[in-house]
Design a protein with these regions (language model features):
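Short, basic (Lys/Arg/His-rich) helix/loop patches that form interaction surfaces
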Residues: 232-281
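DNA breakage-rejoining catalytic core of tyrosine-based enzymes
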Residues: 99-101, 112-133, 183-194, 209-214
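Short, charged phosphate-coordinating catalytic segments
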Residues: 151-173
Length: 315
């Protein structure tokens, strides 16, 4: 890849340096892995075109978009992920003085729906309380039911759920201590009596399987910690069966995956009257304003508010 600053001579060196920069900025290993995967596809595309990184222009980006959209059949959300990785990469190159500017920013504003429409979080599918009740009560498998109910009752991310160990559950006050992550400020989440019922049911089954790992959720095949795809499959097959998930639709609102539980959790707590700052605390959102650092919420008060506002699902 000729034409680029000689300090970094190969695409792999660039990727390695970029990944180190991402880690220094506090990004998760999973986010860095996804960025690198997208960037390797872009770099291979440039290699086939015999184009260097500092020679990329709008026409090359249009060609890459055509390649992703029409040859790889990438969906809109996937396209956004590709160009998010590219934008972060070109930000880094510009910061290091390896390119003159980030050419991705104006391109994605024009061609990608998320940025063209000027919103940051596309509308995800939102189930009613009755629909969520139908979903979780349609799940007979004790592990999958526990996953669905725990996601709905806590609003935690898929990665946070996967890292929960059995010992992280506090049965005295119905809380879970999550593993530390750069994305989260508050590590304690609460659950209610409905969630406790399905968790205990799953733990009885899990105990009979006698896994060596301390992971709360395990694979039936390997008896090891459940994977990201394992959680996805555990949710999507039931949502699809009830008509809540259409894998063939290009619209995000026609899809239902693990992150939709977080959207549901947030929306229904707010609709049930929970103060916004309490919802942010339960979600573990980063404190963005200086005054937030000095605003401490009493844990017991937060727990009472949670129990008053979290919807019942009739499990």
């Amino acid at each position: 890849m000729e034409g680029l600053n000689a300090r970094l001579t190969s695409p792999e060196e660039l990727l390695k340096s970029f990944a180190e920069d991402c880690k220094l900025r506090g990004m998760t290993d999973e986010s860095i892995r996804r960025y690198k995967s997208s960037l390797r596809i872009f770099l291979k595309f440039l290699e086939q075109k015999e184009v260097s990184l500092d020679s990329v222009d709008m026409e090359i980006l249009r060609d890459f978009l055509r390649y992703l959209r029409f040859e790889r059949k990438a969906k809109e959300k996937t396209l956004e992920n590709y160009f998010s990785a590219l934008s972060a990469f070109y930000d880094y190159l510009a910061f290091e003085g390896l390119v003159s500017s980030n050419v991705i920013l104006p391109f994605r504003r024009r061609y990608l729906r998320r940025y063209k429409n000027g919103y940051d979080d596309p509308e995800r599918r939102l189930l009613s309380v009755e629909e969520m009740s139908r979903l979780v009560n349609s799940i007979m498998d004790p592990r999958d039911k526990a996953i669905a109910v725990l996601l709905a009752k806590t609003g935690i991310r898929r990665g946070e759920l996967l890292r929960i160990d059995v010992d992280d559950i506090n049965w005295e006050d119905y809380s879970i201590m999550l593993k530390p992550t750069p994305k989260r400020s508050n590590r304690v989440v609460f659950f209610d009596d409905e969630c406790a019922i399905v968790l205990r049911r799953w733990l009885r089954v899990r105990e009979k399987l006698n896994p060596k790992t301390n992971a709360l959720f395990i694979s039936y095949n390997t008896l090891d910690r459940l994977s990201r795809n394992g959680v996805w499959n555990a949710i999507v097959k039931y949502a699809k069966r009830l008509g809540f998930h259409n894998p063939n639709s290009p619209r995000l609102e026609d899809h239902f995956g693990p992150h939709c539980f977080r959207h549901w959790f947030t929306t229904w707590l707010l609709r049930n009257g929970m103060p916004r700052e309490y919802v942010k605390e339960l979600r573990g959102d980063k404190r963005r304003e200086a005054i937030d650092i000095y605003h401490h919420i009493d844990k017991e008060e937060l727990r009472r508010a949670y129990l008053a506002c979290i919807p019942k699902l009739g499990v």
